[in-house]
Swiss-Prot record:
GO biological process: mRNA catabolic process; RNA processing
Phylogenetic classification of the source organism: Bacteria, Pseudomonadati, Pseudomonadota, Gammaproteobacteria, Enterobacterales
Low complexity composition bias: residue spans: 694-711
Boundaries of every KH domain copy: 553-612
UniProt-recorded name of the protein: Polyribonucleotide nucleotidyltransferase
Species of provenance: Shigella boydii serotype 18 (strain CDC 3083-94 / BS512)
Domain S1 motif: residue ranges: 622-690
Cofactor(s) this protein cannot do without: Mg(2+)
HAMAP family in alphabetical order: PNPase (MF_01595)
Length: 711
C-alpha cells in the first residue's frame, strides 16, 4: 500500500507541502514539494559504490519543466519537450551551487538529482520550490550530505524586504535575490537589483537566511519520520607517510613556482614539478596510485597559496590583497559594429559588441510562466583559445549561459526604457583571454560598448570578483581574483554596479562560518575596486555618444488614428508589405496607432512617413484632387486619388454631356481632376470629373505630410 508521509508549513505568504513515500519508490529518495499550486517532483539516486579510478565528484542536477504543468501542449514540431531551455539550465545551476559543497571531501560516488515541474501557479516561480525539494530529497536519501539547506527569494518593495514575492510583486520590486544556506551559514546568493546600497544588499541576504530556517526545521522533522539510514561511508584513510614524502619532494619547488606571475609560464613549471615528483615516487614504489599522488600534490598547491595569503605575503602575481590588475580600456575597436570595446584586466580580456535592432528583433520566450518578449539580449562566448587550449566549438555550455546571465544582470538596471529608446539591443562578449572573472570583464566591456553605440544607459557599470581565504578566525578578502585564487579559495564573490549602487551580486561559498562581518568587509572592498575601475573606464568614454552609429537603423516614430491601422496594413498585409519593399524600411504598428519606421537612410524613412501620411489622410468632401485612372468599366472609371484610396467616377459624372463610351473620354493612367462628392459609411468614395472642371479653383494634390510642410 502507498503510505505517503506529509509535512505542511507556512512559509511567508505561501503554504509549503513536503510529501514522500508515494511516488518513485525505487529512487534513493523522492519528494513532491508544492507551494500554492506550484509543485516540483524531485528525485535523488546515488550509487553505493564509486567507479574505480574516479577522481572527481560526479554530481548531476537536471531541472525540467513540463508544459502540462501550465495546462499547455508544447509548440514545437514534435509537440514534446526538447533539450533544456536557457531558463531550465540556469535553475539547474541554481540548485547545484549550494548543494555541491555539502558533500564530504573524498566522496566520489555518482549522484543525480532530477527536478520535474509538474504543476505551476503563474504567481509562484518553481525555482525556490525545486531547491527546497532537492534539499529534502538529499536529506532523506541517507547519502552523505551535510544539509539540509533552505532557499528563499527576497524582494525589496517600499523600503521593505519581502519574502518569496509573487510574480506581480516582483514587477514592483527593486530587488530579485535568491539566497540558500544551511542552518548556520549562507552558501549561495544570486541577485539583480536596481542599484541598491551595500547595506541594503547585505540586509536582504541576512533576511533571506533568517526566514529560510523554517524550511530547514521542517525538512529535519520529515527526515526523522521518513529518512533512510545514513550510508556507512568513510573517506579513505590519510597516508601520512606518503603525504610527508610528497611534500618533501615538491612543496618548496611549488612554492617557488607560485611566485611566477605569468600564468602560462607558471602552469608549465607546476606541470613539470608534478610530473617529476610522480615519476620519482613511482620509481621508488610501483604500487602507488598516480591519481592519489595527483590529489596530494593539489592539496600542497592549495596550502602553499593559502598560507602565503594568510601570512600577508604578496599574492601569486605579486599584488597586495586589495590591488587590481593593470587595466586597458579601448572603445570603437571594430569599424562596422554599432558599438564595440576591448576591456583588458591583467590576463583577462573581453571583446564586447553592442548591436541595435528593431522591436521585430526581440526574442519571444515561450516560458512555463507565460510568453514574454526580451528586448535586451546578452550572449557570452568562452572559446578554448582564451585559456590556451584546444577544444570543441559549438552551442553554449551551461557555464557560458550562467556567466552570460550574470553579466546581463549587471547591466540590466541601467538600460533605458523602451519608450525612450525603442531598440532591441544585443550585447555579445567574446572572451579572448581568461585568468579570473571573465563575467565581470564582460560587464565592464558591455557598459563601454553600449556607450560607444550611443545607447543612453543611466550610468556606467563595472564588475569585480572577490575571493576569500579563511583559516579559523584569520581571514583575508582578495580583490580581483585570478583563476587559481578562485579554485583554491573559500568564496567566489562577484559584484557589479555603478557609482550609485549594486546591480548584481553573486556569491558561492565553499565553507561554513562566513559571517555577516566578513561579507560586509568583502562588499566594501568590492565597492572600492568597482569605483577604481569606473574611474579608468570614464577616461576612455565618460558618457553615451550623442548619436547612434551610422550603420545602425534609425527609428522614427509617428502617430496615426487607430481606425486607420487597417488601411496601412491592407488586406492580408498587402499594403504594409508593398510599403516596406517600396521604401526599403522596416515598419511596425502598435494597437494605439504608434508607427515605428526603422531605416539606415534618413531619406528612405522620410519617404515611408510621407506614404503613410498619404494613406491615412482624411478625404474631404467637396475638395478637388488630381487623380489617376486605374480601371475603366462600362458604367464609369475608378480613379486613385493618393494614399492608396480609390473612388468611382460614374459615367454620368465624366462630362457635361451624355457619354456613350467611357474610353472616348478617359484612358488608363490618365491624370484627371476629380471632386469628392461623397464618402459613404463603408468608406466608398464617389467622384466627379464634370464638377471638378466646372470649378474655377486649381486642382489640389493630396495633403502633403507634416514632415514636408515643416521643411
Amino acid at each position: 500500500m502507498l503510505n505517503p508521509i506529509v509535512r505542511k508549513f507556512q512559509y511567508g505568504q505561501h503554504t509549503v507541502t513536503l510529501e514522500t513515500g508515494m511516488m518513485a519508490r525505487q529512487a534513493t529518495a523522492a519528494v513532491m514539494v508544492s507551494m500554492d499550486d506550484t509543485a516540483v517532483f524531485v528525485t535523488v539516486v546515488g550509487q553505493k559504490k564509486a567507479k574505480p579510478g574516479q577522481d572527481f565528484f560526479p554530481l548531476t542536477v537536471n531541472y525540467q519543466e513540463r508544459t502540462y504543468a501550465a495546462g499547455r501542449i508544447p509548440g514545437s514540431f514534435f509537440r514534446r519537450e526538447g533539450r533544456p531551455s536557457e531558463g531550465e539550465t540556469l535553475i539547474a545551476r541554481l540548485i547545484d551551487r549550494p548543494i555541491r559543497p555539502l558533500f564530504p571531501e573524498g566522496f566520489v560516488n555518482e549522484v543525480q538529482v532530477i527536478a520535474t515541474v509538474v504543476s505551476v501557479n503563474p504567481q509562484v516561480n518553481p525555482d525556490i520550490v525545486a531547491m527546497i525539494g532537492a534539499s529534502a530529497a538529499l536529506s532523506l536519501s541517507g547519502i552523505p550530505f551535510n544539509g539540509p539547506i533552505g532557499a528563499a527569494r527576497v524582494g525589496y518593495i517600499n523600503d521593505q524586504y519581502v519574502l518569496n514575492p509573487t510574480q506581480d510583486e516582483l514587477k514592483e520590486s527593486k530587488l530579485d535575490l535568491v539566497v540558500a544556506g544551511t542552518e548556520a551559514a549562507v552558501l549561495m546568493v544570486e541577485s539583480e537589483a536596481e542599484l541598491l546600497s551595500e547595506d541594503q544588499m547585505l540586509g536582504a541576504v541576512v533576511f533571506g537566511h533568517e526566514q529560510q530556517q523554517v524550511v530547514i526545521q521542517n525538512i529535519n522533522e520529515l527526515v526523522k519520520e521518513a529518512g533512510k539510514p545514513r550510508w556507512d561511508w568513510q573517506p579513505e584513510p590519510v597516508n601520512e607517510a606518503l603525504n610527508a614524502r610528497v611534500a618533501a619532494l615538491a612543496e618548496a619547488r611549488l612554492s617557488d613556482a607560485y611566485r611566477i606571475t605569468d600564468k602560462q609560464e607558471r602552469y608549465a613549471q607546476v606541470d613539470v614539478i608534478k610530473s617529476e615528483t610522480i615519476a620519482t615516487l613511482l620509481a621508488e614504489d610501483e604500487t602507488l596510485d598516480e591519481n592519489e599522488l595527483g590529489e596530494i600534490l593539489h592539496a600542497i598547491e592549495k596550502n602553499v597559496v593559502r598560507s602565503r595569503v594568510l601570512a600577508g605575503e604578496p599574492r601569486i602575481d605579486g599584488r597586495e590583497k586589495d590591488m587590481i590588475r593593470g587595466l586597458d580600456v579601448r572603445t570603437g575597436v571594430l569599424p562596422r559594429t554599432h558599438g564595440s570595446a576591448l576591456f583588458t584586466r591583467g590576463e583577462t580580456q573581453a571583446l564586447v559588441t553592442a548591436t541595435l535592432g528593431t522591436a521585430r528583433d526581440a526574442q519571444v520566450l515561450d516560458e512555463l510562466m507565460g510568453e514574454r518578449t526580451d528586448t535586451f539580449l546578452f550572449h557570452y562566448n568562452f572559446p578554448p583559445y582564451s585559456v590556451g587550449e584546444t577544444g570543441m566549438v559549438g552551442s553554449p555550455k551551461r557555464r557560458e549561459i550562467g556567466h552570460g546571465r550574470l553579466a546581463k544582470r549587471g547591466v540590466l538596471a541601467v538600460m533605458p526604457d523602451m519608450d525612450k529608446f525603442p531598440y532591441t539591443v544585443r550585447v555579445v562578449s567574446e572572451i579572448t583571454e581568461s585568468n579570473g572573472s571573465s563575467s565581470m570583464a564582460s560587464v565592464c566591456g558591455a557598459s563601454l560598448a553600449l556607450m560607444d553605440a550611443g545607447v543612453p544607459i543611466k550610468a556606467a557599470v563595472a564588475g569585480i570578483a572577490m575571493g576569500l581565504v579563511k583559516e579559523g578566525d584569520n581571514y583575508v578578502v582578495l580583490s580581483d581574483i585570478l583563476g587559481d585564487e578562485d579554485h583554491l579559495g573559500d568564496m567566489d564573490f562577484k559584484v557589479a554596479g555603478s557609482r550609485e549602487g549594486i546591480s548584481a551580486l553573486q556569491m558561492d561559498i565553499k565553507i561554513e562560518g562566513i559571517t555577516k562581518e566578513i561579507m560586509q568587509v568583502a562588499l566594501n572592498q568590492a565597492k572600492g575596486a568597482r569605483l577604481h575601475i569606473l574611474g579608468v573606464m570614464e577616461q576612455a568614454i565618460n558618457a553615451p555618444r550623442g548619436d547612434i552609429s551610422e550603420f545602425a537603423p534609425r527609428i522614427h516614430t509617428i502617430k496615426i488614428n487607430p481606425d486607420k491601422i487597417k488601411d496601412v496594413i491592407g488586406k492580408g498585409g498587402s499594403v504594409i508589405r508593398a510599403l516596406t519593399d517600396e521604401t526599403g524600411t522596416t515598419i511596425e504598428i502598435e494597437d494605439d496607432g504608434t508607427v515605428k519606421i526603422a531605416a539606415t537612410d534618413g531619406e528612405k524613412a522620410k519617404h515611408a512617413i510621407r506614404r503613410i501620411e498619404e494613406i491615412t489622410a482624411e478625404i474631404e468632401v467637396g475638395r478637388v484632387y488630381t487623380g489617376k485612372v486605374t480601371r475603366i468599366v462600362d458604367f464609369g472609371a475608378f480613379v486613385a486619388i493618393g494614399g492608396g484610396k480609390e473612388g468611382l467616377v460614374h459615367i454620368s459624372q465624366i462630362a457635361d454631356k451624355r457619354v456613350e463610351k467611357v474610353t472616348d473620354y478617359l484612358q488608363m493612367g490618365q491624370e484627371v481632376p476629380v471632386k469628392v462628392l461623397e464618402v459613404d459609411r463603408q468608406g466608398r468614395i464617389r467622384l466627379s470629373i464634370k464638377e471638378a472642371t466646372e470649378q474655377s479653383q486649381p486642382a489640389a494634390a493630396p495633403e502633403a505630410p507634416a514632415a514636408e510642410q515643416g521643411e
